[in-house]
């Protein structure tokens, strides 16, 4: 975990881009129907990954913005309601912080993605925003949860451990 402001910024950038890359690969694969083919996501191609990486360049910035403005603070506040660092296991508190941050970030980023990809770039009517957002959230939440818990957060902690040692 970061011990000062500089480390916190680096941690935030790595975590934001780890999440953006994973979620963009997932969403691009779904958009291109990869999950519907026999074998599902094992049919992923470098073309899908390349397109996702291009989108992740700017979506990572959106993740940083949302997490800095309200995602991290609200997630920490929610976690503090169920976890007391003085009494509870530190690992439990870390998991609660991650889970509560996902509870805030996934709906926020799903809304941002709906506005960017469905409304602005896709031309969907604004009155469809609530329905499209709900569908996007339902699609993204399981992936965001498991990607964060088992890939992005462990990778970020490992990378920061190596960078800050």
List the predicted regions and their residue ranges.
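Juxtamembrane/disordered regions of integral membrane proteins
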Residues: 1-165
């Amino acid at each position: 975990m970061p011990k000062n402001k500089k480390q916190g910024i680096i941690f935030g950038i790595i975590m934001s881009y780890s999440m953006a890359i994973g979620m963009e690969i997932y969403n691009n694969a779904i958009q291109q129907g990869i999950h519907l083919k026999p074998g599902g996501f094992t049919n992923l191609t470098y073309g899908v990954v390349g397109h996702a990486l291009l989108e992740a360049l700017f979506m990572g910035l959106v993740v940083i913005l949302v997490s800095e403005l309200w995602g991290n603070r609200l997630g920490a506040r929610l976690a503090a309601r169920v976890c007391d660092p003085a009494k509870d296991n530190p690992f439990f508190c870390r998991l609660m912080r991650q889970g509560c941050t996902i509870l805030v970030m996934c709906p926020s980023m799903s809304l941002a993605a709906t506005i960017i990809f469905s409304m602005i770039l896709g031309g969907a009517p604004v009155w469809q925003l609530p329905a499209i957002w709900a569908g996007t959230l339902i699609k993204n939440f399981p992936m965001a949860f498991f990607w964060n818990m088992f890939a992005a957060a462990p990778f970020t902690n490992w990378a920061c451990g190596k960078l800050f040692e």
